Structure formats: structure tokens, C-alpha cells
């Protein structure tokens, strides 16, 4: 068995056992989940890194979603995923209580999952650092406001392990899950590529998360702040896995530094000229 196959097997087995043991913990049958550890420090990730898309690609895709007569109803949600970096399971788990429009805060404290059996479960965030409060930008605030105001009122208000008032629900009133959005993104990208000659790469909810992190890194967000926003327990995960800065970014940084140096020289030159002028005036006096 290859290293990649071993890694995938371990991840698959843990993915099955972790939620099962978590249910035992929730039912007070166990004190601690033995599979609650993070794989980052246990196995080396040999899979190909899922790349972020560029800001230009993101904007083109969002415009397509906004203007398309089929996918326009998903625009607010997709915009939020691109501009908050939330995990899709965190987004699907959001309830009305988690969205503070008055103070413009998103309270992320759980995630929703659905098993093959069809049973729904409310789980803790992926790591303890995943429990966090995210501030809303003006645009993200407007997206959430629209979702809340247009939330269907004719669907049943289901309760999952004490949680109710889910923001995004399916036709039966159940909270939507990651699989819903994986399929939507897949079909939306296919529709985009059927229309436009310049093809869009594969986009998933997780690509949205990668893209958000990379865009924040390009904007020179403080690394510790970015770690908090992403909900990572280790900053190395933030910087090594979720940032995809390349040659163009390096060129932009060199240009930026050159512009800063030129501006600094110009300021120094102005200051010298000012000092000379003042000295001349004093001599004249």
C-alpha cells in the first residue's frame, strides 16, 4: 500500500469513528473521544493541495452566480463562503441565534453533519479554535440580512439535538449539509464552463475557504488574526496549507516595496529642501 493510500485509509477510518465516539461522549457513555485528535501532527499529508482560485476568478464566478437565472438564489450564501472562510459544515449549522445582525457578529460554535443513515447530528467545531466569533463586513452583513429576511416561513422548524432555527434548510425543513453545496458548486461550474470559452477550475466550498485565506494573506492580514478567523489550532496550518501565493504575488510585493522606497526617498528629499529653505530664511532674518 502506498503512503497516499495509507493516509487516505487512516483519514477515512477516523472520519467514521470520530462522530460515532462523539455520540457516545454526548450520551455520557464515554468521558473523552479517543478519536478527537487532529491528523496534522500524526500523519504527513501527501495529497495534492487544493488550490485557491484567483481574485479575478472569484469575482467572475460570483458575477455569473448573481446574474444566472438558475443559480442566483444561491448568490448570498456563496458570497458569504468566499468572504468569511467558514467551513461548509459550520455555515450549514448556523441558526438565527448565531447571526447577530445588530452587532454584525457571526457566532460559530457548532457544525451540522448528516450520516449515510440519514441521521443528523450537531457536532463541536473541528478544533477548539474553531469556536469563534467573526465580524461581518458591510457586504457580508447585507448578504446575511437578505438571507434572514427572505428565509422561508412555510417550512417546519425542526430541532436537531436542541438546535432550531437553521438559516439554510432543504424542502423538508432540515438543515442543509455539505453534500448539497458540493453538488451545487459542481453544477454551477459546469454551467459556467458550458457558456464561457475561458474555463473555470473546480470550485468547492473548501476552495472558497482557501481563497478567503489567500486573499487575506495578500491583504497582509496579521498571521495570528488570520489564524483566529480561519479557526485553526496551529498557525502553521494557516500559513502552509491555506495560503497559495505565487509568482504574481511575489512580483506585486517587489513592486510595492519599490514604490514604498521611492516614496520614502521623495519624502526625504522634500524634508531636506524644507530644511534648506528654513535655514535660508533664518540667515536672511
Regions found by a protein language model. Give the residues of each.
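Basic, Lys/Arg- and aromatic-enriched nucleic-acid-binding interface segment
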Residues: 4-7, 11-15, 26, 30-94, ...
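Catalytic-site neighborhood detector that most strongly recognizes the C-terminal catalytic loop/helix
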Residues: 44, 52, 111-114, 230-256
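C-terminal flanking helix
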Residues: 18-21, 25, 246, 250
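Conserved tyrosine-mediated DNA breakage-rejoining catalytic core shared by Y-recombinases
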Residues: 39-40, 93-153, 159
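Gram-positive cell-envelope targeting signals
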Residues: 5, 52, 90-93, 176, ...
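Short, basic (Lys/Arg/His-rich) helix/loop patches that form interaction surfaces
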Residues: 3-7, 63-74, 134, 150-158, ...
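Short, polar N-cap/turn motifs at the start of nucleic acid-interacting alpha helices
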Residues: 98-105, 221-241
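C-terminal secondary-structure termini that scaffold catalytic or DNA-interacting sites
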Residues: 103, 114-116, 120-131, 138-140, ...
Amino acid at each position: 500500500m502506498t503512503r497516499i493510500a495509507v493516509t487516505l485509509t487512516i483519514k477515512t477510518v477516523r472520519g467514521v469513528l470520530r462522530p460515532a465516539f462523539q455520540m457516545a461522549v454526548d450520551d455520557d457513555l464515554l468521558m473523552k473521544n479517543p478519536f478527537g485528535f487532529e491528523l496534522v501532527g500524526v500523519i504527513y499529508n501527501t495529497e495534492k493541495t487544493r488550490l485557491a482560485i484567483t481574485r479575478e476568478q472569484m469575482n467572475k464566478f460570483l458575477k455569473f452566480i448573481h446574474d444566472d437565472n438558475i443559480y442566483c438564489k444561491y448568490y448570498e450564501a456563496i458570497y458569504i463562503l468566499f468572504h468569511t472562510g467558514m467551513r461548509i459544515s459550520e455555515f450549514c449549522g448556523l441558526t438565527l441565534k448565531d447571526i447577530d445582525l445588530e452587532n454584525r457578529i457571526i457566532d460559530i460554535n457548532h457544525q451540522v453533519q448528516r450520516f449515510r443513515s440519514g441521521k443528523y447530528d450537531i457536532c463541536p467545531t473541528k478544533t477548539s479554535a474553531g469556536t469563534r466569533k467573526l465580524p461581518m463586513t458591510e457586504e457580508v452583513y447585507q448578504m446575511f440580512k437578505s438571507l434572514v429576511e427572505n428565509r422561508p416561513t412555510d417550512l417546519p422548524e425542526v430541532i436537531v439535538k436542541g438546535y432550531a432555527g437553521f438559516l439554510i434548510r432543504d424542502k423538508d425543513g432540515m438543515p442543509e449539509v455539505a453534500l448539497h453545496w458540493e453538488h451545487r458548486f459542481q453544477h454551477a461550474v459546469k454551467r459556467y464552463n458550458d457558456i464561457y470559452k475561458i474555463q473555470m477550475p473546480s470550485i468547492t466550498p473548501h476552495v472558497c475557504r482557501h481563497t478567503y485565506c489567500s486573499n487575506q494573506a495578500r491583504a497582509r492580514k496579521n498571521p495570528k488574526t488570520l489564524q483566529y478567523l480561519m479557526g485553526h489550532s496551529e498557525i502553521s496550518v494557516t500559513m502552509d496549507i491555506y495560503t497559495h501565493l505565487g509568482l504574481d504575488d511575489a512580483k506585486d510585493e517587489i513592486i510595492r516595496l519599490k514604490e514604498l522606497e521611492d516614496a520614502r526617498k521623495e519624502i526625504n528629499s522634500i524634508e531636506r529642501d524644507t530644511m534648506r529653505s528654513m535655514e535660508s530664511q533664518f540667515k536672511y532674518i
